[in-house]
Curated annotation (Swiss-Prot):
InterPro entries membership: Flag_FlgI
Keywords linked to the UniProt accession: Bacterial flagellum, Periplasm, Signal
Signal sequence residues: 1-26
Organism: Rhizobium johnstonii (strain DSM 114642 / LMG 32736 / 3841)
Family: Belongs to the FlgI family.
Lineage, highest ranks first: Bacteria, Pseudomonadati, Pseudomonadota, Alphaproteobacteria, Hyphomicrobiales
Protein name in the entry: Flagellar P-ring protein
Compartment(s) where it occurs, according to its Swiss-Prot or TrEMBL record: Periplasm; Bacterial flagellum basal body
Underlying gene: flgI
Any GO BP annotation: bacterial-type flagellum-dependent cell motility
Function summary: Assembles around the rod to form the L-ring and probably protects the motor/basal body from shearing forces during rotation.
NCBIfam families hit by this protein: PRK05303.1
Pfam families: FlgI
Domain of life: Bacteria
Length: 373
């Protein structure tokens, strides 16, 4: 609990110190860091392949018959006869291969791929992905992947124990795919640029349009940008402008950003993230917990020697109840530092903080969006 409160306090102090020491740096960003070009989005690729060279950690052909079928088909394509008995070697694994095709990627360039086991393989460490075609949503092949697989986790197994750290059934092949086909792009023929904000906000969109118009008025003699909504800003191409150079100039412009106040809660991990703009109206909070502990300590009763009795187990149950908390605290958060200090004064665990924030939101005192994950 102390570690959690130290973490929350550290986040608060860091946010406040940045706001006091370097407000211009903390509140401004380049356009390229907060928005992306609509025509420059990634495209997902997928394929099915085999990983070979595993040290007995691959798929079992009984549990994963599709692995054997794929291996036989691959060998037949290589001109090798597959007639004969079934192999019991577990050095092959069937995997799904995924990758992201970046925008404006040209044939011959390389991209990273991710491999994930489909069968009952226990580890992909030490394996090699054999030639696998990667297709897009349109069914066209855009890249071919092959190479050594890198797995971050490891597994050690003995006769009576197994130690596993991380995920051993998924890995990456850095630069393992070569692009064979480029996506059709009409960027140079476009008449406008559409910027999409990664965090939609009307204030930020208006500021981007104003900054771009200021640059365009000085460079081309008139405004060219318009905020379409909270997420998109449309920039018309000036007649005498080169689109690539225009985008390079625009993406390096500095703009003041703005985001709505949010409190993000992950109930599974107990993580709480509080934005610097979160405010809490004066509210009284009381929090208490009732803990009931049930302990079973069965006793073994042995019979007297030569009495022909039987060993019996007599159950013994101890129940203890403890009620903690119950303090009443006044929380009034005009800034992040005061809000965190008020939560720390209550002295509850992270799950208690989550319940308190939900209660404050229900009472209408939390002036922020509460996001539950």
């Amino acid at each position: 609990m102390k570690l959690f409160f130290r973490f929350v306090t550290l986040v608060a102090v860091l946010a406040m110190s940045l706001a006091n020491v370097a407000p211009a740096w903390a509140l401004t960003s380049r356009i390229k860091d907060i928005a992306s070009l609509q025509a420059g989005r990634d495209n997902q690729l997928i394929g099915y392949g085999l990983i070979v060279g595993l040290q007995g950690t691959g798929d079992g052909f009984r549990a994963s018959p599709f692995t054997e079928q794929s291996m036989r088909a691959m060998l037949q394509n290589l001109g090798i006869s597959t007639q004969g008995g079934q192999s019991n070697a577990k050095n092959t694994a069937a995997v799904m291969v995924t990758a992201n095709l970046p925008p404006f990627a040209s044939p011959g360039s390389r991209i990273d791929v991710t491999v994930s086991s489909l069968g009952d393989a226990t580890s992909l460490r030490g394996g090699t992905l054999v030639m696998t075609s990667l297709s897009g949503a349109d069914g066209q092949i855009y890249a071919v992947a092959q190479g050594a697989v890198i797995v971050s986790g490891f597994q050690a197994q003995g006769q009576a124990a197994t130690v596993t750290e991380g995920v051993t059934t998924a890995g990456r092949v850095p630069g393992g795919a070569i692009i064979e086909r480029e996506l059709p792009s009409r960027f140079k023929d476009s008449v406008n640029l559409v910027l999409q904000l990664r965090n939609p906000d009307f204030s930020t969109a208006i500021r981007i349009a104003d900054i771009v118009n200021g640059y365009a008025s000085a460079r081309f003699g008139g405004p060219v940008a318009e905020a379409k909504d909270s997420q998109e800003v449309v920039i018309q191409k000036p007649r005498a402008a080169d689109l690539t150079r225009l985008m390079a100039d625009v993406e390096n412009l500095i703009v003041e950003t703005d985001t709505p106040a949010k409190v993000v809660i992950n109930e599974r991990t107990g993580t709480i993230v509080i934005g610097s703009d979160v405010r809490v109206s004066p509210v009284a909070v009381s929090y208490g917990t009732l803990t009931v502990q049930v302990t079973e300590t069965p006793q073994i009763i042995q019979p007297e020697p030569f009495s022909r009795g039987r060993t019996a187990v007599q159950p013994q149950t101890d129940i203890a109840a403890e009620q903690t908390g119950g303090r009443v605290a006044i929380i009034d958060g005009p800034d992040l530092r005061t809000l965190v200090a008020g939560l720390n004064n209550i002295g509850v665990k992270p799950d208690g903080i989550i319940a308190i924030l939900q209660g404050i939101k229900s009472a209408g005192a939390l002036q922020a969006e509460l996001v539950l994950q």
